[in-house]
Amino acid sequence: MTAFAAWALYALLTRRWLAAASLACLAGLTRPNGVAVAAAVLAAVGCALWRTRGRSGPRVWAAGLLAPAGWLSYVLWVGVRSGDPLGGYFAVQKGWTSRFDFGKGALVFVRDMLGGPTQFGFAMALLITGAGVLLFALLVCGERLPLPVLAYTAVLVVIAVGGSGFFESKPRFLLPAFPLLLPLAAALTKARPRAAILVVTALAGLSCCYGAYALTLARMAI
């Protein structure tokens, strides 16, 4: 999904509407949070239509229709497989206790976690999610970025933060949100080479250790 997203954003920035929509469609077929790529395309399409007062070419309109088709097809396919074309996907999510409640469940989980002993994986999930929110705030408040990039990142952050029932998996939901690294990358360009190397090495080491722990020692699903 991340590759589809990166190239879709590039296609949007270069006004290759059908290529961007096709990649968004494929992203929606790979993972449910691929809807973020479709959201980026729809944001760009909406902006283009607003600027031209609806007089954009047929490719812009086609992109708006094609972009969410992959995600909608995925949802319908899950529904058909579960016996309820329209509600089956959401029933499956409910069965996994996965739901979107604007972060209420996550806040309750954090409150309970801070009130007593907790597993290392949960603590890391909280740390990574908090860092993601902070980086998103820096992204929004920093230099002006293209609307598709902001829309894509915002949807991924909202899904990760606002969802409940999968707290330990929140870092995985943020994996495709690579624009969150732009503020850090900008800061590293202004740092001394030794400091930049030290920061990158430390982050890479932390990522490697946490990944090894999550795959081998953690007693929880990621």
Features from the language model and the residues they span:
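Multi-pass, polyprenyl lipid-linked donor-dependent membrane glycosyltransferases
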Residues: 1-7, 27-39, 170-176
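Membrane-interface transmembrane helices that cradle and orient dolichyl/undecaprenyl
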Residues: 6-19, 188
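Transmembrane helix irregularities
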Residues: 12, 26-33, 81, 161-163
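Membrane-lumen/periplasm interface segments of specific transmembrane helices
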Residues: 26, 34, 38-133, 148-153
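Signature aromatic-anchored transmembrane alpha helix within multi-pass, membrane-resident enzymes
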Residues: 64-68, 190-220
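Hydrophobic, aromatic-rich transmembrane alpha-helices
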Residues: 112-115, 119-146, 156-160, 178-184, ...
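Transmembrane-helix signature of polytopic, lipid-linked glycan biosynthesis machinery
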Residues: 151-169, 205-220
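Hydrophobic/aromatic-rich transmembrane helices and adjacent perimembrane loops
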Residues: 168-188
